[in-house]
Amino acid sequence: MNIIKKIEGEHLRFDLPKFKSGDTVKVHLRIVEGEKERIQVFQGNVIRIHRGTTGGTFTVRKVSDGVGVERVFPLHSPFIDRVEMVTEGRVRRSRLYYLRELKGKAARIKPKNRF
């Protein structure tokens, strides 16, 4: 069992910011096309986080041209260049699946009040 934890520990990333459900993030992905490499940015609301060792994931949702797009990212993926926090949201749930049914202004997440 210790051997597995040791191997998993080598692949963990500690450079990601602390974010939670409801936060708006920009995920910078490293895309390799043939011999070229480029960075693609995906910005949206975090609707789910599954924290685990190397199998942890988070789901980001955005609305593009009126169509909802959700993408699941592995937390410790080497293809994630960086994750930027845009805003912190104030929500009372850890899974924000109800946002899928809402449209327009109702689908907004209130910003967190900082005093």
UniProtKB/Swiss-Prot annotation:
Source superkingdom: Bacteria
Ribonucleoprotein recorded as keyword: yes
GO cellular component, as recorded: cytosolic large ribosomal subunit
InterPro entries per UniProt: Ribosomal_bL19, Ribosomal_bL19_CS, Ribosomal_bL19_sf, Translation_prot_SH3-like_sf
One BP term from GO: translation
One function term, GO molecular function aspect: structural constituent of ribosome
SUPFAM superfamilies assigned: Translation proteins SH3-like domain (SSF50104)
Keyword set, alphabetical order: Ribonucleoprotein, Ribosomal protein
PANTHER family on file: LARGE RIBOSOMAL SUBUNIT PROTEIN BL19M, RIBOSOMAL PROTEIN L19
Listed HAMAP family: Ribosomal_bL19 (MF_00402)
Similarity section: Belongs to the bacterial ribosomal protein bL19 family.
UniProt function note: This protein is located at the 30S-50S ribosomal subunit interface and may play a role in the structure and function of the aminoacyl-tRNA binding site.
Protein name, UniProt field: Large ribosomal subunit protein bL19
Organism: Nitratidesulfovibrio vulgaris (strain DSM 19637 / Miyazaki F)
Organism classification: Bacteria, Pseudomonadati, Thermodesulfobacteriota, Desulfovibrionia, Desulfovibrionales
